């Protein structure tokens, strides 16, 4: 199936009571690809050829008929979710992650970083609560380069 345009976004209504949703699962880095050959989680062959330079987003609806729809979501990835108890722990966590140039997302009261075995001892040392789990990223990390 050739797909050349995005029809909408279903990020806020992932499940539909009348239509089956097939997912194209991508690494979040792949969201910027405009040409891609892949398949859905149900095995439907997909050729993606999009115009423009707007990146794909979690929930982008690529195809739909009366029985099913095909949309984008990111793959589950191993992450470390840090849950500081107060501003002191938040500050220590942010300082240490920033000092290492570790990209992070802040959602609700959590700091989320990609799993990295070198971060766990650091978090243990500063005494902040964290857990290693899996999540789907709904937005990309923002890398900010600089030089010393």
Swiss-Prot record:
Database matches in SMART domains: UreE_N
GO biological process: protein folding; protein-containing complex assembly; urea metabolic process
UniProt KW keywords: Chaperone, Cytoplasm, Nickel
One GO CC term, this protein: cytoplasm
Pfam families, sorted: UreE_C (PF05194), UreE_N (PF02814)
Protein's job: Involved in urease metallocenter assembly. Binds nickel. Probably functions as a nickel donor during metallocenter assembly.
Family label: Belongs to the UreE family.
Protein name: Urease accessory protein UreE
Source organism: Lysinibacillus sphaericus (strain C3-41)
């Amino acid at each position: 199936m050739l797909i050349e345009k995005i029809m909408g976004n279903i990020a806020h209504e992932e499940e539909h009571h009348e239509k089956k949703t097939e997912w194209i699962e991508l690494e979040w880095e792949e969201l910027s690809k405009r040409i891609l050959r892949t398949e859905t989680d149900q095995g439907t062959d997909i050729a993606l050829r999009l115009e423009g330079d707007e990146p794909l987003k979690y929930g982008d609806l690529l195809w739909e008929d009366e029985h099913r729809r095909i949309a984008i979501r990111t793959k589950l990835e191993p992450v470390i979710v840090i849950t500081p108890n107060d501003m002191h722990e938040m500050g220590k966590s942010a300082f240490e992650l920033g000092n290492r140039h570790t990209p992070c997302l802040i959602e609700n009261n959590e700091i989320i970083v990609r799993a990295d075995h070198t971060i766990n001892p650091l978090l243990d040392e500063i005494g902040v609560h964290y857990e290693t789990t899996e999540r789907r990223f709904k937005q990309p990390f923002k890398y900010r380069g600089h030089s010393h």
